[in-house]
C-alpha cells in the first residue's frame, strides 16, 4: 500500500493525515461525498478540520467538488487517489481563499 496518497495514508496509518498551513494552524483532512445525487451524479471534496489547543476542533475549510461519479464511492475514488502533496496544495488554496 502506498501511503503517499490520501487513501493509502489512511489505510496504512489508520488515521487522517495532518498538515500545518500558512495561517499557522494545524489541520487534518477527510473526504466527503454527497448523500444524494444531483442530476444523476455525486460530488466529492476535501474537508480540512482546523485544530485548536488540545484536541478540540475550532473550524474547518472545504474544497469545491473535486470529482463526480455515478455513486458516492465512484466520486470519492479520485479524491482518495490524490497525493499528499496535492492535498496540501488544496489546503493552501483554501487558506488563501479564506484570508482574502
Regions found by a protein language model. Name each.
Residues 59-100:
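Short, compact, well-ordered microdomains
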Residues 1-28:
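Negatively charged, low-complexity tracts enriched in Asp/Glu with abundant Ser/Thr
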Residues 1, 10, 29, 46-48, ...:
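Generic hydrophobic secondary-structure signal
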Residues 29-66:
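A short, structured beta-strand/loop element
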Residues 18, 22, 40-42, 82:
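Broad hydrophobic/π-residue packing in well-ordered secondary structure
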Residues 2-3, 23, 34-38, 64, ...:
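Acidic-enriched, low-complexity/disordered segments with a strong bias for Aspartate over Glutamate
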Residues 11, 19-20, 49-51, 56-59, ...:
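Charge-rich alpha-helical segments
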Amino acid at each position: 500500500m502506498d501511503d503517499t496518497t490520501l487513501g493509502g495514508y489512511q489505510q496504512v496509518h489508520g488515521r487522517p493525515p495532518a498538515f500545518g498551513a500558512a495561517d499557522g494552524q494545524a489541520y487534518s483532512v477527510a473526504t466527503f461525498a454527497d448523500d444524494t445525487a444531483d442530476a444523476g451524479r455525486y460530488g466529492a471534496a476535501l474537508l480540512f478540520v482546523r485544530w485548536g489547543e488540545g484536541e478540540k476542533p475550532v473550524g474547518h475549510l472545504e474544497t469545491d467538488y473535486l470529482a463526480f461519479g455515478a455513486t458516492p464511492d465512484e466520486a470519492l475514488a479520485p479524491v482518495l487517489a490524490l497525493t499528499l502533496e496535492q492535498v496540501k496544495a488544496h489546503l493552501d488554496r483554501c487558506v488563501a481563499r479564506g484570508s482574502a
